[in-house]
């Protein structure tokens, strides 16, 4: 993998990859400041998202639902993540499958067992709605798709673990703050 990224003009972040290579690798492109994160079996940022069983689909990247999770599960979400999320919502309908759609059934299952993930997605959905208005994109379509997604999430029965954690609520932190490697699109 390292040779592939190097042939494409990316350089591995040696320190980060040495410390985190068992779960995540980071490659940076020096000219345009692009960053590629490679997650190994799971995405561990503010929440842990298991990906091992989600990688068998056709396509060069994660499914739209997993890409959406990669953005919305970040508690301290930045404008780049909000823009990316808006683009995903504009480009992909909500459905119960992964074929060029955001799999709402999958997201509902994940959030029905993890109150913290549910809460972070809930907060960030509001932030995406606000950002869509500022960005002057089709905020009605974004609202419609988020409403459809939350209809599925809210309809999914919640686990006992979810219900117990919900009683604690926001009084206790429900997320981890990952190490910030660098700001998106900024060279070192």
Regions found by a protein language model. Give the residues of each.
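The feature captures the alpha-helical scaffold/lid subdomain characteristic of nucleotidyltransferase
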Residues: 34, 40, 44-60, 64-188
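Conserved catalytic core of two-metal-ion nucleotidyltransferases
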Residues: 2-46
